[in-house]
């Protein structure tokens, strides 16, 4: 945005190498995330109650054991039940990053706001929300990136989803 406005402001970032990345939900998308992260020499932590197949270089932990170790938490779980609320945010180390590309209701929004204001979470990216379109208070936080539920919004993904739907219909008959 700044460069579009003619400003050349450099902000220092955070390197992935050496960080612990927690993937909550280790289905198809969670596994792809793990594969993409491996070249960055990160420690991969996974929380998934229904894990079907282990992957080399991945540590499978309970959420209570994984959260205190994670520098970055990325959520790709299915379901509708809240996963991260007040008690889970208390376990997270100060200065962590949080990404949610799963379901909005998996994170308690009030607890996330408290974590942002306290510095527990220093950056968040949210692509899903409990109520959409989203008009809530997270819009005012500069350290939060909000996208309008576009994680699967590509031509290729939509075609794949359509083909899968057709296959499911055909296999039912």
Annotate each language-model stretch with its function.
Residues 1-20, 32-35:
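Phosphate-binding beta-alpha-beta segment of Rossmann-like dinucleotide-binding domains, i.e.
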Residues 26-27:
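Glycine-rich Rossmann-fold phosphate-binding loop(s) that bind the pyrophosphate
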Residues 38-56:
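NAD(P)-binding Rossmann-fold cofactor-contacting core
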Residues 50-137:
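Rossmann-like adenosine-cofactor binding region
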